[in-house]
């Protein structure tokens, strides 16, 4: 899984470097439109030096226009790692010919071998096929047309909306069962599955946003709006039901996101994520601590909620507490005690109304 995370991180960094709106992408697009083809290497370390033959050492500031003009020559362009300087123009690259390559064209074969040999980012711009291919180490990625990515991103947003509705239904039903004291592991796992799917689609949309660059601003806004409060509530759900109260619920949610990015999770995986043995029955009754529900009461800060849970242990304990018992909790006076009682009653009524609508 660590290897996959590193791979994803590398791809994000690469896509951000050549995303629409960046000077480098503007220059690459100019070369693509001119149909001259081109080979661009980012980074000039000892390994690159050993395979560069000839060329003009110009060491000038990067500009899209300069890239376009210099790409008219047959050789490769060598840039610094950040793409802010053009170091060498018209360079001949001589990588180790024994390195395997799946490419057929000379330009792309050279690009793949240079990337594998040096680990540097190499951009190959096809002369006839209007395709931009990125290579780094064993990574190979073909940039898609912006229109295609936008279509896929919008489809993913629509799918996310559907799973958000599934989450809303599940979390409403769970809230009602919490007040009725009849929650089983099955209901908790069901809600966590909807969180898993939301996070899986979020990861996919983020990859589109990275590739879209400045063109992905609206998609990012939609994603932010759709996920507003969902992840925070999911973290509190984990805090409510994890076997160990002291576990960092945000870290567990992050672990869920990492797992969602690599595989479809079984019920037993989610049960284990909550600190229980994988063979735990889904019909087993579980009791919420009450962090999620009490956080919905207005003007009750997290420190007071922590004091409440420490005193009454569970949501049921908080609900059954009298005004005097609530008043005894540190930080809660008589006025706030009444607000907590009224707040819990309003939340319960709202949940019942939501279920019948």
UniProtKB/Swiss-Prot annotation:
One of its GO terms (molecular function) is ATP binding. Keywords: ATP-binding, DNA damage, DNA repair, DNA-binding, Magnesium, Nucleotide-binding, Nucleotidyltransferase, Transferase. Its cofactor is Mg(2+). Gene3D superfamilies: 5' to 3' exonuclease, C-terminal subdomain, DNA integrity scanning linker region, DNA integrity scanning protein, DisA, N-terminal domain. The keyword Cell membrane does not apply. GO terms for biological process: DNA repair. It catalyses: 2 ATP = 3',3'-c-di-AMP + 2 diphosphate. Pfam families: DAC, DisA-linker. Residues 8-146 form the DAC domain. Its EC number is 2.7.7.85. ATP binds at residues 75, 93, 106-110. It comes from the Bacteria. Homooctamer. Participates in a DNA-damage check-point that is active prior to asymmetric division when DNA is damaged. DisA forms globular foci that rapidly scan along the chromosomes during sporulation, searching for lesions. When a lesion is present, DisA pauses at the lesion site. This triggers a cellular response that culminates in a temporary block in sporulation initiation. Also has diadenylate cyclase activity, catalyzing the condensation of 2 ATP molecules into cyclic di-AMP (c-di-AMP). c-di-AMP acts as a signaling molecule that couples DNA integrity with progression of sporulation. The rise in c-di-AMP level generated by DisA while scanning the chromosome, operates as a positive signal that advances sporulation; upon encountering a lesion, the DisA focus arrests at the damaged site and halts c-di-AMP synthesis. HAMAP family: DisA (MF_01438). Belongs to the DisA family. This is DNA integrity scanning protein DisA.
């Amino acid at each position: 899984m660590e290897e996959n995370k590193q791979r994803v991180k590398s791809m994000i960094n690469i896509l951000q470097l050549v995303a629409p709106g960046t000077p480098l992408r503007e220059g690459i697009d100019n070369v693509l439109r001119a149909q001259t083809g081109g080979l661009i290497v980012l980074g000039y370390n000892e390994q690159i030096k050993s395979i560069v033959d000839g060329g003009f050492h110009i060491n000038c500031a990067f500009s899209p226009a300069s890239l376009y003009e210099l790409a008219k020559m047959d050789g490769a362009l060598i840039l610094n790692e950040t793409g802010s300087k053009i170091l060498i123009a018209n360079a001949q690259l001589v990588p180790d010919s024994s390195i395997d390559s799946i490419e057929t064209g000379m330009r792309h074969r050279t690009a793949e071998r240079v990337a594998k040999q040096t680990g540097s980012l190499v951009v190959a711009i096809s002369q006839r096929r209007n395709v931009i291919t990125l290579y780094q180490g064993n990574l190979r990625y073909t940039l898609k047309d912006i229109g295609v990515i936008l279509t896929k991103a919008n489809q993913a947003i629509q799918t996310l909306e559907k799973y958000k509705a599934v989450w809303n239904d599940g979390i409403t039903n769970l809230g009602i069962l919490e007040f009725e004291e009849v929650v089983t592991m099955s209901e908790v796992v069901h809600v966590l599955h909807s969180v898993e799917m939301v996070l899986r689609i979020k990861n996919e949309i983020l990859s589109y946003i990275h590739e879209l660059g400045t063109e992905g601003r609206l998609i990012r806004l939609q994603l932010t709006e759709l996920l507003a409060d969902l992840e925070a509530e999911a973290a509190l759900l984990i805090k409510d039901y994890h076997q160990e109260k002291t576990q960092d619920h945000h870290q567990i949610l992050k672990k869920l996101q990492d797992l969602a990015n690599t595989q479809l999770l079984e019920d037993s995986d989610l049960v284990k994520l909550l600190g229980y043995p994988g063979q735990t029955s889904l019909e087993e009754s579980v009791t919420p601590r009450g962090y999620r529900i009490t956080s919905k009461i207005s003007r009750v800060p997290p420190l007071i909620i922590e004091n409440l849970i420490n005193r009454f242990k569970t949501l049921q304990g908080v609900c059954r507490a009298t005004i005097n018992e609530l008043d005894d909790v540190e930080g809660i006076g008589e006025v706030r005690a009444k607000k907590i009682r009224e707040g819990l009653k309003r939340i319960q009524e709202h949940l019942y109304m939501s279920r019948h609508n």
